[in-house]
Amino acid sequence: LVIIGLAGPVLNPDRARTPGSGPVLVLLDGGWGGAQDWAARMELADQLLAEAARDARTAAVIRVSQPEAAEVLPADVWRGRLPGLAPLPWLPGPQSAARLEAVLPQGQFETLWLSDALDFDGRAAVLAALEARGPVRIYQSGRAPVALRPTVVEGEALRLTALRATPDAAREISVAAHG
C-alpha cells in the first residue's frame, strides 16, 4: 500500500509563468450568454484564483450583469465562494456598466475578464475603466452563445427559433422543455 499526498508547492509548476503582484479582479459578464459553458468558466476562474493564491495575492470577483461592492479578500476565500455564483437570465446593460464603475476596488489591480463575447451598451466604458486601473486580460470561449426566440404555436406543433450571435456555420443545439 502506497499513499502519496501533495500539498503546495505545485508538483509541475509552469516555469514560464511570472508570478503576479497586487490585487486581481476576476470579472464575469454573468448573463445568459455564458450559461451554456458556465461550469467551464467557473473552472477557469478557479484556476486563475489558484494562481493568485500561490502568489499570495488578494482578489475580488464581480459579475457585470449584477455588480455588487467588490470584496478584496485572499484569493483562496474567493475560490470557496465560486460555487455560489450562477449566470443570470439577462445581459449586462448600461445601468450595470455604470454601477460596475462605482463598485470597482480602489487603487490599481489586474483584471481577468471571463467574457461571453456578447457586446452590450457600456462595454467600452467598462473596458476603459478597467484599463485605467491596470492590465486587462480577456478570456472568451470559442463557442458563440445561442438565444431562443419565443415559442410559436402552429396548430398542434410548437416552433422554436434559435439565433446565433455570429453568422458562422450552422450547428446543432439541444433544447430541453419541461411542462
Q: Residues of each region from the PLM?
A:
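N-linked glycosylation sequons
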Residues: 1-179
